[in-house]
């Protein structure tokens, strides 16, 4: 038991940090939605998607693996807030995780991650900043902004961890635009979607994300009884694969499964944190009031 925990803690600057970025936080952005209209492939009209600005709280906990001799546990909480700022969407995310074991003398490690982003409603402009903490000490910080032209090409200007500017390839999407595109694909009956997405909190380069979209269903695990905002709203399983540096084997760097409602709320998530099987359960859902926007 002690060896397993110690190994996981020593991986704090590699596997754990990458696990944080590639798992919980990046694809909670699936609920970060962009209003507007896109066209689906082959000229099919985009399905209407009505998103729900909200604040959601998730309880994170490790899952037991049958037959495992040693167990490293992780638990925590994630707070996700999506705000309509009239000209764009502001996203606030904060997560805390505690890694430890079942023995009283085991060392515990605490991790915290914060992110604030803003994206214009036309999917062309994007600002981001994130920071990580390990046992209360500040770690990685990232800050920058990106833009995408009507031609599909884009550019990134970074402030942290280093200052610089570089181009983005044609066809790249910003995260909120990609999130809405996923919901539109699901509502239109598509079963698969692949895109290059620039997020900034993971890498200065775009990430290839593939999504397998399942059929929709009502009353998933009776969550609509607990959360009135989910009543009469379909949800569906979405399996995501992330490719940071695609190799010849074609294997993803990370995978994650979500139960996603058609209004953008995530009901459940299943992922891996530093090799530990994890789940995230929706425990609180507050609907945000709409901003009073001035006419342009």
Regions found by a protein language model. Name each.
Residues 48-53, 81-90, 118-124, 229-232, ...:
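A short, structured loop/turn motif at beta-sheet edges
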Residues 57-63, 93-98, 128-133, 238-247:
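Short beta-strand segments that buttress and anchor functional surface loops
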Residues 93-150:
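Hydrophobic/aromatic-rich structural module bridging two neighboring secondary-structure elements via a short loop
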Residues 131-296:
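Mature, soluble, non-transmembrane domains
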Residues 73-78, 110-114, 139-143, 251-255:
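Short, surface-exposed coil-to-beta transition loops
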Residues 27-41:
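Bacterial N-terminal signal peptides
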């Amino acid at each position: 038991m002690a060896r397993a925990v110690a190994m996981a803690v020593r991986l704090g600057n590699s596997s754990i940090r990458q696990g944080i970025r590639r798992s919980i936080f990046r694809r909670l952005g699936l609920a970060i939605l962009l209003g507007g209209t896109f066209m689906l492939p082959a000229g099919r009209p985009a399905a209407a998607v009505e998103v729900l600005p909200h604040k959601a709280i998730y309880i994170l906990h490790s899952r037991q693996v049958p037959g495992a001799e040693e167990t490293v546990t992780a638990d925590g909480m994630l707070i996700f807030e999506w705000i309509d700022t009239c000209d764009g969407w502001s996203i606030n995310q904060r997560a805390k995780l505690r890694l430890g074991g079942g023995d009283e003398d085991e060392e515990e490690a605490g991790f915290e991650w914060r992110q604030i982003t803003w994206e214009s409603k036309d999917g062309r402009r994007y600002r981001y900043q994130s920071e990580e903490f390990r046992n209360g000490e500040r770690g990685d910080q990232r800050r920058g902004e990106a833009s995408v032209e009507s031609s599909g090409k884009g550019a990134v200007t970074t402030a942290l961890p280093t200052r610089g500017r570089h181009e983005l390839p044609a066809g790249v999407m910003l995260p909120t635009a990609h999130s809405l595109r996923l919901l539109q694909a699901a509502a239109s009956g598509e079963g698969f979607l692949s895109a290059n997405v620039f997020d900034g909190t993971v890498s200065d380069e775009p990430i290839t994300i593939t999504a397998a979209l399942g059929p929709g269903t009502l009353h998933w695990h009776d969550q609509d009884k607990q959360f009135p905002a989910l009543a009469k709203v379909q949800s569906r399983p979405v399996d995501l694969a992330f490719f940071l540096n695609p190799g010849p084997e074609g294997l993803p760097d990370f995978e994650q499964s979500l139960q996603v409602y058609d209004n953008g709320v995530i009901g459940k998530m299943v992922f891996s944190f530093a090799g530990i099987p994890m789940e995230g359960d929706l425990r609180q859902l507050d609907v945000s009031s709409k901003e009073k926007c001035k006419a342009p």
